Regions:
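Pre-recognition alpha-helix immediately N-terminal to the DNA-recognition helix
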Residues: 21-29, 75, 95, 99
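Short alpha-helical functional segments enriched in proximate histidine and acidic residues
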Residues: 29, 79, 103, 136
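Short coil/turn segments at alpha/beta junctions that flank glycine-rich nucleotide-binding fingerprints
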Residues: 32-36, 107, 143
């Protein structure tokens, strides 16, 4: 029984290693020449596997590309969550804007793969990534500081940060000052300032006696 379990475990590890090799080969080709140039034949040659092996693990070319892109989204989301967000929800959104751009500039190949492909239906990994932004915006709404509906604010903020990131990666280089200006303008437009703390109106007994 132990021998059988060991054999199953070995096969699972080998299968996972094969999938990882195929995904790495696919990512390298996509990064170098894009989706249109990708062929199963070249993936096979680079990964050292046969076409039936790829179809067994991933189904078809479209599903294979989806898996590569999803892995990029998972890494992206993990990176954005790696550092604790500030306690103030507006500052958390501001910090998220900066971290988003930092990731895109540090991983331009992954970023292009994530957003260069047209999708009829976003995958769970892509939706989970966007949901992180939506939750930050919802936290602002929860304390009464959002000027517009959550969905509209999240979409507008994402358009802004994606635009800055994409332009910078493409070589237009709007620069950090312009990025901060866009970030702060969006926050000013979408959110309300924090209310000032109320001062207590209760006079101290000693103060009352002194004024009598």
């Amino acid at each position: 029984m132990a021998v059988r379990q060991g054999s199953v475990g070995l096969r699972e590890r080998e299968s996972e290693s094969t999938r990882r090799t195929i995904l790495e080969a696919t990512e390298a080709i996509l990064a170098a020449r894009g989706e249109e140039a990708l062929s199963i034949r070249e993936v096979c040659a680079r990964a050292g596997v046969t076409a039936p092996t790829i179809y067994h693990h991933f189904g078809d070319k479209a599903a294979l590309i989806d898996r590569v892109v999803d892995a990029c989204f998972v890494e992206f989301d993990r990176t954005l969550r790696a550092r604790p967000a500030p306690g103030d929800p507006v500052e958390a959104l501001r910090s998220g804007f900066d971290r988003y751009i930092d990731y895109g500039l540090a991983h331009p190949t992954h970023y292009r793969l994530m957003f260069s492909r047209r999708r009829a239906h976003p995958t769970p990994a892509a939706l989970a990534s966007y949901d992180g932004l939506r939750r930050r915006v919802a936290a602002i709404a929860a304390v009464g500081r959002l000027r517009v509906p959550v969905e509209e604010a999240a979409a507008a903020f994402w358009c802004a940060v994606h635009g800055v990131t994409s332009l910078t990666i493409a070589g237009w280089q709007p620069g950090a000052p312009a990025a901060r200006l866009v970030r702060d303008a969006m926050i000013t437009q979408l959110t309300r300032p924090a209310p000032f703390p109320r001062r207590s109106r209760t006079a101290s007994p000693r103060g009352s006696e002194g004024s009598a």
